[in-house]
Amino acid sequence: MFKATLKGLTPNTTYSYRLKYSDGTEEYISDAVSFTTEVATALVNGNMDDWYQSGKTWYAASEGYFTENGGSFWDSSNPGTTTGAGALVNVNPTQGNSVTVHTAGGKSAELKSQYASAFGIGKFAAASLYAGSFNSLVGTNGAKIDFGQPFTSRPTRLHGFFRYTAGTIDYVGSNTPSNLGIISGSTPDVCSIYIALTTRTYQVDNTDTSTFIDYENDSGIVAYGELPVSECVSTDGLWKEFNIDLKYRTLTTKPTHIIIVCSSSKYGDYFTGSTGSLMYLDDLELVYGDTPTLK
């Protein structure tokens, strides 16, 4: 069987090809066959330059995008500390920053883990930025998050830059798995960045670990990739470039949604992390055209 790989094709373009064969005496040419390359959808506000404040809450979106779409492609933990009962706390752990940037003249996303409290009631809050939407608070214990935004393209990796200062973990949630070996006051915090292409959205209740997404085994995951934990450490005040390869389970199933999650404290879902952890993200982009990695 003959196989060929074509590179450098233009996205969303129809091509025609014929197969040509010669046995030395005669030449054979097949009928023309056409195919259309997929759309290479860009990441919404991947450069992190657009920020809009709705009420007390900051979003990584332009005012025009937010108004036209009734919300932002990116959400964060901000609604949990600026809306409803969270409005008493009134802090935005995730905001735009125009000083600490990778590209001059733009902005970055600043994610600052902190202890959010009001009237003596509070929780450790890892700053986050994710493709999805904040759903609701779960009393004073946590929140429900809807992960995933509509997306049908198939990139091969996520590329970008981050800058991270890891504090020493000073809050350990009661439901933190013991096998993580985390010791308050001793274990350094780590950040996290991961991406998934899926065939559905997911609602996670961070007070109920049974709702957490199993990216390795869930049938709705088409492709997944994460920044290795060994790279999720302090960058010594420097910007660090990263590339996360998407590992595809199959090339026959097309995704319907994309999930990207970034957090200044990897175990923030368990209310575990450091109030000294600070992360910046900038110039995120989806890369297309490479040979896809199969799991």
Task: State what each model feature region is.
Residues 164-171, 183-188, 201-204:
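Extended, low-complexity, turn-rich repeat/linker tracts enriched in Gly/Pro/Ser/Thr and Asp/Glu
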